[in-house]
Amino acid sequence: MAVRWTWAGKSCLLLALLTLAYILVEFSVSTLYASPGAGGARELGPRRLPDLDTREEDLSQPLYIKPPADSHALGEWGRASKLQLNEGELKQQEELIERYAINIYLSDRISLHRHIEDKRMYECKAKKFHYRSLPTTSVIIAFYNEAWSTLLRTIHSVLETSPAVLLKEIILVDDLSDRIYLKAQLETYISNLERVRLIRTNKREGLVRARLIGATFATGDVLTFLDCHCECNTGWLEPLLERISRDETAIVCPVIDTIDWNTFEFYMQTGEPMIGGFDWRLTFQWHSVPKHERDRRTSRIDPIRSPTMAGGLFAVSKKYFQYLGTYDTGMEVWGGENLELSFRVWQCGGKLEIHPCSHVGHVFPKRAPYARPNFLQNTARAAEVWMDEYKEHFYNRNPPARKEAYGDLSERKLLRERLKCKSFDWYLKNVFSNLHVPEDRPGWHGAIRSMGISSECLDYNAPDNNPTGANLSLFGCHGQGGNQFFEYTSNKEIRFNSVTELCAEVPQQKDYVGMQNCPKDGLPVPVNIIWHFKEDGTIFHPHTRLCLSAYRTAEGRPSVHMKTCDALDKNQLWRFEK
């Protein structure tokens, strides 16, 4: 018996040593205390659990204190900055913009600890919190080839604005970056920062799986996900954690303030924030708060219910996130995961909110810094699992999505069944009732091809931030939906509703076709947006008594205008096709 015990003891000892070796290798960059002045910040020192006699206001202190503000420094208080550059410096700046889609040349010259003016509502500033009763959080920041200064400014911003008693850790997840400065240089830098851990993936995982890797190592009660080019404002964390402490089924987002990619000006929203929505291509959109939600809230600082979230910045109870099925790991890189999670939380008994007292700035790059080749695959997965029969509206506007190999969905569908989730019809009626649901009547939606110039289809391409700022035109038929998808409704409207609900109109005394916002459901239809799409293929506008006609400009470019109807003119014939 003694011999058996000795061998068992040896086996246990060997197993313990192997486990210890694994942990040492796995956490090659461990959490260390910061030396005084690390990264330019003043350390408060290692913090103990608060004593019972510690005052509540003292519990609000962050782990690190920002250096004193320098009103003359670039970007201080969130001001816009512009450098006077010579030809060589300007070339360097443009090269960095091309690489990162952000003005990193300027970012590198702005303090990592800059101060941001606190423009929160008075009620937010006056709000008191019971810190001892709030849950702790792990802040998870996944990154891939992020610029040095924007990544470090994000880290310092969290450390310098989050109460030390609430911030369990910052977990950085490096998704196989290949930039040299993100190797040993980053490890050395964060080894001087308290409560910051670095995890590196062994292969490119994409945002969804990289975040999940971070979540598996998190020890906080709440998971707070941030993008890697953010700046947190004063008091950003407490409202999120307090809301979750009161309702664990709430996923709560901060108000996302804009940091200009070129000047680094911090635009803080001071009024009512926008809420999330989507169009029928399953692209995220911002919307104003509807009246029924304003009426439901009793205070300006009450959380605002949102049908969807942007996805980059949110907090969720770790237990609830696991119960809800975390992320769909079948999604690649990024894109679509935000809508999938939004549909899931609402349909499965939770809620999604934006807290008006929590503000985090986000640098919106000039363009996406890397491609999203799997966006349609991701959105198709969301549509197949959560949208029921309404997924046809998505496919109609994204014909290539029907051919996407979106992978095995059996586990996600079982999850929906196990959680006893509601239908998408319920979601539209109870959560996003303001969204117009297309009719998509058979034979009356899709691309509208000209019979006179048969290679061309009606096309609408509005400028950014001005949905009605263009005219209807012709462009080569591409079969991709999008800007060539139209719907002829039972109200006799020609709707362009892939992005925004727009209706074709003929402005008074004009011969071109513009676009205006469609009337809300149930309201009268203006006469200038009523069309008769006849069986013979003509598109007649009763108010002007004219017909839509294709033609070529003097330069030979195909276009459309309104013209006297002529039954023999083939340029006035059109047909819908999928």
UniProtKB/Swiss-Prot annotation:
Residue intervals of the Ricin B-type lectin domain: 444-577
Where does the record place the region Catalytic subdomain A?
A: 134-243
Tell me which tissues or organs this protein is expressed in: Highly expressed in sublingual gland, stomach, colon, small intestine and cervix. Expressed at intermediate levels in kidney, ovary, lung and uterus. Weakly expressed in spleen, liver, heart and brain. Not expressed in submandibular and parotid glands, skeletal muscle and testis.
A Gene Ontology term for the protein's cellular component: perinuclear region of cytoplasm
Listed under catalytic activity are:
L-seryl-[protein] + UDP-N-acetyl-alpha-D-galactosamine = a 3-O-[N-acetyl-alpha-D-galactosaminyl]-L-seryl-[protein] + UDP + H(+); L-threonyl-[protein] + UDP-N-acetyl-alpha-D-galactosamine = a 3-O-[N-acetyl-alpha-D-galactosaminyl]-L-threonyl-[protein] + UDP + H(+)
Q: Which GO terms describe its biological process?
A: protein O-linked glycosylation via serine; protein O-linked glycosylation via threonine
Query: Which sites carry carbohydrate?
Result: N471
Q: Which residues point to the Cytoplasmic side? A: 1-12
Residues annotated as binding Mn(2+): D227, H229, H362
User: What residue spans carry the region label Catalytic subdomain B?
Assistant: 303-365
- Report the record's disulfide bonds: C124-C357, C348-C421, C457-C477, C503-C518, C547-C565
Question: Topology in the membrane?
Answer: Single-pass type II membrane protein
Where in the cell does this protein reside? Golgi apparatus membrane
Fetch the InterPro entries from UniProt: GalNAc-T, Glyco_trans_2-like, Nucleotide-diphossugar_trans, Ricin_B-like_lectins, Ricin_B_lectin
Note whether Metal-binding occurs among the keywords.
yes
| Biological function | Catalyzes the initial reaction in O-linked oligosaccharide biosynthesis, the transfer of an N-acetyl-D-galactosamine residue to a serine or threonine residue on the protein receptor. Has a highest activity toward EA2 peptide substrate and a much lower activity with EPO-T, Muc2, Muc1a, Muc1b.
Domain statement: There are two conserved domains in the glycosyltransferase region: the N-terminal domain (domain A, also called GT1 motif), which is probably involved in manganese coordination and substrate binding and the C-terminal domain (domain B, also called Gal/GalNAc-T motif), which is probably involved in catalytic reaction and UDP-Gal binding. The ricin B-type lectin domain directs the glycopeptide specificity. It is required in the glycopeptide specificity of enzyme activity but not for activity with naked peptide substrates, suggesting that it triggers the catalytic domain to act on GalNAc-glycopeptide substrates.
The name this protein goes by in its record: Polypeptide N-acetylgalactosaminyltransferase 4
